[in-house]
Amino acid sequence: MRLRRRLFLSLAAGLIGGLLALPAQAQRVIRLVVPFGPGAVQDAVARAFSNEMAQFLGASVVVENRAGAGGTIGASLVAKSPADGNTLILAGSSHHIAGHMYKSLNYDPQKDFAGVTFLGTAGYVITVPPALGLNTLADFVREAKSKPGKFNFASAGNGSATHLAMAAFNARAGLEMQHIPMKSTGDAVNEVLAARVQAVASATTGVVGFKGDPRLRMLAFTGARRTQYLPDVPTVAELGFPGFQFEAWVGMLAPAGTPRAEIDRLSAAAQKALALPAVQERMAKLGTEYAPISPDQFQALLHADWETMGNVVKVSGAKIE
């Protein structure tokens, strides 16, 4: 009897010790894919709120850059991921632009994604190298018109918003320029810094750090009104092109089929993060205009933007070379 009791106690002690030795349940990890490289609006926005969102979720949110092909590499990855809320994309208007510009994609930009959280809109800064000797947008237009096909502009990649912003302006101004696609906004701005290209339409985040820097000249802003972080840069509309406006949205999407309860949970956590003063300050510095809306309202915005970007692509004549 005593032997059996000692054996039982020994086994129980071993079992309890084993249970205590087991690691705690792994924290949930959410991948937030950014389909562009450092310097892009999407990358800066993702890093502005993801840590706080993670705290509200009780999870880890890892920002993962998957740049290339106008954002389609990252979008394809997310479209093919399980619809469980663990893989999201920080997308923007380039998500729809690519859908209208690429002849064939292995995913549907509309049907394969569901809106989670709207994060804002942003304009672009038409920037040139001072070596050109052009001080105003009018100077730039005059010079580019005198040399059709001789001026080049860099972008964050084929089908990116930086591509279409410049293409849309070229169409409005009657300019013929060659497109030089890069892998990121940072790379595109570097091309201007080195005076290897004549222009870039950069996200505010890509050039605001160069404010006052003699290596760059910021000629115009494509937004509806001047950005508070570059208040001396006039809008394109102010400079002889009334009504011109190019602004891109940024937002968080999930694979289609993600349960609505999961979308609502993710959206609620993001909204709580965006309501924090520290996050609002970071977002404001990115030049984004933000207003809280529901996932349903965001989905309606996505449908409208799909049509808008299709028209912009058509009017601009932009295409994938």
Annotate each predicted stretch with a short phrase.
Residues 1-23:
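Twin-arginine (Tat) signal peptide motif
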Residues 22-111, 150, 158, 174-201, ...:
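N-terminal (or domain-start) structured segment
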Residues 27-29, 171-175, 260-321:
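An extracytoplasmic/periplasmic, membrane-proximal ligand-sensing/linker region
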Residues 41-45, 49, 53, 70, ...:
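Stable alpha-helical elements in mature extracytoplasmic
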Residues 80-86, 100-187, 236, 249-282:
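Hinge/capping helix and adjacent helix->loop/strand transition within the periplasmic-binding protein
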Residues 90-95, 155, 185, 202-207, ...:
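Beta->alpha turn/N-cap motifs
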Residues 121, 207-275, 304-307:
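C-terminal lobe and pocket-closing loops
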